[in-house]
Regions:
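Histidine-anchored nucleotide/phosphate-binding helix
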Residues: 93, 271-285
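Ferredoxin-type iron-sulfur electron-transfer modules in oxidoreductases and energy-metabolism complexes
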Residues: 17, 21-111, 115-147, 151-180, ...
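Gly-rich Lys/Arg/Thr-decorated short loops/hinges at beta-loop-alpha junctions or inter-strand turns
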Residues: 193-200, 252-264, 358-363, 409-414
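Short amphipathic, charge-patterned alpha-helical segments
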Residues: 278-282, 424-441
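Short strand-turn-strand beta-turns centered on an Asx-Gly dipeptide
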Residues: 158-160, 411-417, 450-451
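Hydrophobic alpha-helical positions that pack around
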Residues: 303-424, 436
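Accessory "access/gating" subregions that flank catalytic or transport cores
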Residues: 205-244, 393-396, 409, 421-422, ...
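Flexible inter-domain linker/hinge segments
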Residues: 174-221, 371-394
Length: 581
């Protein structure tokens, strides 16, 4: 297992220092005892670890309602970090409220109203404006990015309790009702899962009854790819990490912040142990010495559920390698694998330059197997039938020449939004008609996002294109996390593209100029009644070519889709094939 020296060495770079003039010492006010008590309570009796900084910050804010300057200073002292290091981490993440000396704390209750694609189409922006005047000064109303419940738009979160299909009356009632926590979902728990045959495959792999190479071969034959968005072949990733020197680590990404995506939430709410078993199989086959699970802060009930079920797994098998559950803090960029690793290490979630890749130099400087939750969820269903000689329920599916199953998060102007598990290669028209009950009454298909905000936009005339990895590139789009956002003749593609670009500008980590400046500049230019097509095209090309990570590289996609498929909306010359919105 990785030791504390390795953890510290991999967690943060060496510290430089400057000589300070002896006759000009820096003076600081002594910390009050209450600040040290608050920091000590946040540590909860643990040996202080710099990589757990974000968790300590969460505990401070959970207890005190905000991050007060004295508390941050005391926490830095306890962790033996510079105050600036703690401050830069706390100020990076959107969910932390820093209160400087002399400033007033925020109201005790915050209502967060989603304004991302699906919720904006359902009136989320107007809802936020209404609540800001209705709820009074003792409640803070924030407009926030996607909260992962797009199938129930619009959504407001009162404290930590989501109000689905929200309106001003239902949110006001939730505020008055006083309940602030979301109840645990009715998921399949450990005892029920094990009684139905769960964990038998993992035990067979662990005992050596089933060889690791056999498991990898089954994944290879099924064609399982990373289902968080990148689509990298899972079997190849397992082989690559297994070939690296020990200790090897594992990071699981449940930070599904892509607007329109909620499939991982669905799987955790219904059958979390299928994912946990897949994770344990992967860990054994690859030779993993420690596992870190990173779940988005917007899913507090799922975090509590997962923590409890992991405790039951540890109780059943006490000799498991360490498994740590970490929560994010509202940074979309931490869905990128290297930014997530930086966050797990207790730092700002800023993507790393590559190479080296995380499979070689990842978490705490060690080779790291990184996977999305859904990828691991399918492992048992692929491997068990393959070993039994039966048909593979994953690879035997598919249409239009594609292979496998996909979990589509469908939202927008359809009658029945939700997670649809169906054939890879299905078309948008087939998906909506066969699984979503068609369009809402009175609505006609005008266009859709095939892969969330970053996946670009396609017009209705391209509703018969197969939806899968590698099928949408010719149209300047990609499937990504398979977040399908459907819009109708009552929507404007340009407004949705502006929404997406403002989201990317808000979520840019700021590390590289093409993304930091490019998203902000594009968002400004896109507000003009007539777009400057040449300038926006040049700006988008620069962002795609020069940005460090996928955020800046994909941010121009919706903008470029409007120029290509909906030029009539932005005063750009071109044939109007889509019909006026």
């Amino acid at each position: 297992m990785i030791d504390e020296k390795q953890r510290s060495a991999g967690a943060r770079p060496g510290k430089g220092s400057r000589e300070r003039s002896a006759d000009r010492p820096r003076r600081r006010e002594p910390l009050p005892p209450s600040a040290r008590l608050a920091a000590s309570a946040a540590l909860a009796g643990e040996t202080p670890r710099a990589d757990r900084l974000i968790e300590y910050l969460h505990r401070l804010q959970d207890e005190h309602g905000a991050l007060f300057a004295d508390h941050l200073a005391a926490l830095a002292e306890a962790l033996q970090l510079a105050r600036a290091e703690v401050y830069e981490v706390a100020s990076f993440y959107h969910h932390f409220d820093i209160v400087r000396a002399g400033e007033a704390a925020p109201p005790a209750l915050t209502v967060r109203v989603c304004e991302s694609l699906g919720c904006a189409m359902a009136g989320g922006v107007e809802l936020a404006a209404s609540l800001a005047t209705r709820l009074g000064a003792d409640v803070r109303v924030q407009r926030v990015p996607c909260v992962g419940r797009c199938d129930s738009a619009p959504v407001a979160v009162v404290g930590q309790k989501p109000v689905l299909h929200a309106d001003a009356d239902s949110v006001a009632a939730a505020v008055a009702g006083g309940e602030r926590d979301e109840p645990l979902p009715d998921a399949i728990r450990f005892d029920a899962y094990r009684a139905a045959g769960g964990y038998r495959l993992w035990q067979a792999v662990r005992s050596g009854e089933i060889a690791g190479d056999t498991v990898i071969a089954a994944l290879d034959a099924a064609g399982l790819r990373g289902l968080g968005g990148a689509g990298f072949p899972a079997a190849r990733k397992w082989r690559t990490v297994a070939a690296q020197p020990a200790p090897r680590l594992m990071a699981v990404n449940i930070d599904e912040g892509e607007p329109g995506t909620f499939k991982d939430r669905h799987y955790l709410e219904t059958d979390p142990h299928r994912f946990i078993e897949g994770m344990l199989i992967a860990a054994h086959v690859v030779g993993i010495d420690g596992i870190w699970i990173y779940i988005r802060d917007e899913y507090p009930a799922l975090r509590r559920l997962l923590a409890g079920e992991l405790d039951r797994v540890r109780a059943a098998w006490p000799d498991l390698s360490p498994i740590e559950l970490r929560r994010g803090a509202g940074a979309y960029v931490c869905g990128e694998e290297s930014a997530m690793i930086e966050s797990i290490e207790g730092k700002r979630g800023m993507p790393r330059l590559r190479p080296p890749y995380v499979a070689e130099v990842g978490l705490f400087g060690r080779p790291t197997l990184e996977h999305n939750l859904e990828t691991l969820w399918w492992v048992r269903d692929i491997v068990a039938p393959a070993l039994a000689g039966g048909p593979d329920p994953f690879a035997s599916r598919g249409r239009n020449g594609r292979k496998g199953l996909r979990s589509f998060s469908v939202s927008g102007r359809v009658l029945r939004p939700g997670v649809v598990v169906t054939d890879a290669g299905i078309t948008l028209r087939e998906l909506v008609d066969e699984h979503c009950g068609g369009m809402l009454p009175g609505h006609e298909l005008y266009g859709y996002f095939p892969g969330g905000a970053s996946g670009g936009m396609l017009p209705a005339r391209l509703a018969d294109v197969p939806l899968d990895f590698d099928t949408l590139g010719a149209y300047g789009c990609f499937i990504g996390s398979a977040a399908i956002v459907v819009f109708s003749q009552f929507d404007r593609a340009r407004v949705l593209a502006e929404n997406a670009m403002e989201f990317f500008a808000h979520e840019s980590c700021g590390q590289c100029t093409p993304c930091r400046v490019g998203t902000a500049k594009a968002a400004e230019l896109m507000k003009q009644p007539a777009w400057d097509a040449a300038l926006l095209t040049e700006l988008g090309t620069t962002m795609m070519d020069a940005s460090i990570c996928g955020l800046g590289q994909a941010a121009p996609n919706p903008m470029q889709s409007v120029l290509r498929f909906f030029p009539h909306e932005v005063g750009v010359a071109g044939e109007n094939k889509e019909g006026a919105a």
